Amino acid sequence: MSASVVLQPGQVTLAQWRALYRGAEVTLDPACAQAVLRSAQTVEAIVARGEPVYGVNTGFGKLASVRIERDDLQTLQRNIVLSHAAGVGDPTPVPVVRLMMALKLTSLAQGASGIQPDTLALLEAMLRQGITPVVPCQGSVGASGDLAPLSHLAAVMIGVGEAFVGDQRLPAADALARAQLQPRVLGAKEGLALLNGTQFSTACALAGLFEIETVLQAALVTGALSVEAAKGSDTPFDARIHALRGQPGQIATAAALRALMAESAIRESHRLGDVRVQDPYCLRCQPQVMGAALDVMRQAARTLEIEANGVSDNPLVFSDTGEALSGGNFHAEPVAFAADMLALAVCEIGSISERRTAMLVDPALSGLPAFLTPRPGLNSGFMIPQVTAAALVSENKQCAYPASVDSIPTSANQEDHVSMAAHGARRLLAMADNAAHVIGIELLAAVQGCDFHAPLRSSAALEAARALLRAQVPTLQDDRYFHPDMLAASALVRSGALATAVGIVLPGVELSA
């Protein structure tokens, strides 16, 4: 675990969410306690007045017109958790669930949900002590909130379901008891407050954003290495070209490519007398493609940062006036749109990378030995790794179909338009993983291509990247079992080690990055 992140409700930065996803501990700013208490007292006053308020003393969804007696309000809240814990599929990764828990924590702590202070304290304690609910990954349509996934979170808080504690999967009651925590008996509105909201979709989208950001930065490094391997030109990265268009992502990625290739002996060796006029688009248009991806990612990041700091419960409690107002903040359309944009971005990052690998293995395009092997024919070299990259890119293209354009009415047509944000966001981790493999294959191919130019060396930044790979994967002479090489390369991409090794601050999703 890294240093603790202090969550200030409504003011959590993207960098803090990233740190939390990467393993930072969580502390809730105690300054929120008064707002939480006032909100809970407002709900208690509403119950005492007996006025009908959705989810407080009524049924849910299509059953909203059914009034619930005061003596049954605790049972109502327990029942909604139990009945809505209807997810299926593999468990959501622990880092994503922890992110979801923190998102729910900061949402509830804003004092608009009517949660009891002790319930909020239990959620914070579970995060702090590493009790992570087992949350099946399928079952949310992204409106009315992420009901099924969040119900599996809430179930653990009442002692039902399962939780991960370290590497153990335990019954919820045992997990709480091990940490000397007591399950809660939920009061009026508390069950609904816990399971209504966009926190699952937002957590998945943020996790995808952070992984795709790492992939993009690695792809800038491998893209520069591919230019070197093919003895391509750095002229297309000239700042004057990109300033005339004005697209900020394009300007930033072109600057990164210039910095990565600065003072390369390989580039200088063919600056004069090269008969080629223009490189293929996969080399020449990297700033245009990668810059567009970066701009889209930054737009998605802004949407997700706002969502992560908002309140997506329903109804919302306004303590100043003593009201509980029904609305639709649970509808995750902003998250769905952001997830769709991220899917397009990671798809294109991988697509142009695969084209560079295909270019490198083709001697007619790269001027390098066929399939990057010294003895083609006897050896197949990088023939099939390029095929694997093509397969993964094709898979990502199929996954990139927008989820937000789909909608299936639910709850007897009461919830007649839904966002499908959960599905749209959940696919991002798999797409990022596919792209990491594609970039890893390009890393292997580009470094192999640069090896053919010895004793010429690349820039200091790219030589550091080459050394990082070569510390684990030797130059390919004759064919060998390729699988471990590919896993090693993709791990360097996924971990961020490749982007860090070059010693250059590469553009990221924060506008200041």
Curated annotation (Swiss-Prot):
Modifications after synthesis and translation: Contains an active site 4-methylidene-imidazol-5-one (MIO), which is formed autocatalytically by cyclization and dehydration of residues Ala-Ser-Gly.
Among Pfam families, the record links this protein to: Lyase_aromatic
What organism does the record attribute this protein to? Xanthomonas campestris pv. campestris (strain ATCC 33913 / DSM 3586 / NCPPB 528 / LMG 568 / P 25)
Which EC main class describes this enzyme? Answer: lyase
Statement: the UniProt record of this protein carries the keyword Hydrolase: no
**Record-level GO BP terms:** L-histidine catabolic process; L-histidine catabolic process to glutamate and formamide; L-histidine catabolic process to glutamate and formate
A Gene Ontology cellular-component term: cytoplasm
Full protein name: Histidine ammonia-lyase
Keyword annotations of the record:
Cytoplasm, Histidine metabolism, Lyase
Pathway listed for it is: Amino-acid degradation; L-histidine degradation into L-glutamate; N-formimidoyl-L-glutamate from L-histidine: step 1/3
Q: Which family does it belong to?
A: Belongs to the PAL/histidase family.
Positions of crosslink type 5-imidazolinone (Ala-Gly) = A143-G145
